[in-house]
């Protein structure tokens, strides 16, 4: 009877969790409180990197310190987004129709993928930008983020805020030193170029004489490729489900900072970001690749670090 009970404990993760987590059992030899030789069963449960584990009664818990907190509502959705088991870009948008999409952007997209002579609806459906729910067709959030005429109407957090600070640190109160504060709200396929043009316009240009040739050459305050790659990565991989948040570009006298909303996705950490590749928004990243902004080989981050 004892062995049967022990086996029930050992098999509990397999019998009571969906999907089954990776785990192993371990027995420790001890002397119990009665002075008798005994054993303790330990179950070592590995952290799930890319899945949300549910109990057999469809509940989800997150281990926080020495407590297990049940995840509900928005907290559960955010956990699913973080694990990559749910994707905001693939969810339907019940408020958008084909008439809300920018025809120029759609035309440019069709040209990029060699589908100029194919019906737009057919292209969007084939590429996963149209999904059916109970027999009704809806655009996905990715379609709105990429192609919307008026992105602000859909409250999609598709914004980049540029701040220029006079100095090396931001000050407040009487010493407030923000000299430029510009928000750019556009669909992704317009946002990238709009932000690039604005930042280029804000950069100081220095002139110096080359040693040897004697020619005068101009160089911008910051070289373009690292900061532009940073913006591309932020746009492609940010957490668009993070309500009310936006990408922020802060230009100081001695540096340029790019902040992207949300936590690191899935297996990416601050320590491995330079060599670990994971796309939170695979559909958006694919389209940006087709527009030759993203190469999906983690090259952008490598350029920034080099």
Language model feature labels by segment:
Residues 37-39, 245, 254:
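Beta-strand-connecting loop/turn residues
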Residues 1-60:
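Divalent-cation
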Residues 3-7, 37, 224, 228, ...:
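Amphipathic alpha-helical transducer elements in NTP-driven molecular machines
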Residues 64-243, 251-254, 262-278, 291, ...:
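Active-site helix-to-loop segments that bind/position phosphate- or nucleotide-bearing substrates
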Residues 20-22, 157, 244-246:
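Short secondary-structure junction motifs
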Residues 45, 256-261:
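Conserved DxG motif in ATP/Mg2+-binding regions
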């Amino acid at each position: 009877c004892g062995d049967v009970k022990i086996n029930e404990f050992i098999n509990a993760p397999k019998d009571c969790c969906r999907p089954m987590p990776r785990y192993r059992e371990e027995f420790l030899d001890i002397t119990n409180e009665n002075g008798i030789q005994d054993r303790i069963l330990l179950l070592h449960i590995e952290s799930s990197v890319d899945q949300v584990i549910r109990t057999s009664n469809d509940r989800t818990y997150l281990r926080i310190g020495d407590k297990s907190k049940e995840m509900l509502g928005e907290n559960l959705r955010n956990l699913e987004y973080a694990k990559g088991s749910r994707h905001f870009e693939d969810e339907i948008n019940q408020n958008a129709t084909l008439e809300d999409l920018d025809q120029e952007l759609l035309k440019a997209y069709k040209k990029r993928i060699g589908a100029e002579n194919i019906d737009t609806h057919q292209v969007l459906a084939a590429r996963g930008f149209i999904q059916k729910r109970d027999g009704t067709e809806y655009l996905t959030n990715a379609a709105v983020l990429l192609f919307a005429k008026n992105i602000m109407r859909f409250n999609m957090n598709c914004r980049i805020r540029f701040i220029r600070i006079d100095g090396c640190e931001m000050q407040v109160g009487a010493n407030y030193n923000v000299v430029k504060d510009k928000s750019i709200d556009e669909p992704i396929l317009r946002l990238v170029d709009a932000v690039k043009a604005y930042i280029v316009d804000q950069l100081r240009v220095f002139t110096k004489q080359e040693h040897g040739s004697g020619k005068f050459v101009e160089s911008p305050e910051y070289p373009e490729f690292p900061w532009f790659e940073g913006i591309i990565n932020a746009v492609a991989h940010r957490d668009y489900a993070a309500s009310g948040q936006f990408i922020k570009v802060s230009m100081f006298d001695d540096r340029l900072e790019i902040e992207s909303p949300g936590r690191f996705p899935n297996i990416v950490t601050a320590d491995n970001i330079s060599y670990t590749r994971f796309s939170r928004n695979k559909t958006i990243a694919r389209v940006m690749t087709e527009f030759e902004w993203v190469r999906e080989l983690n090259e952008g981050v490598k350029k920034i670090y080099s």
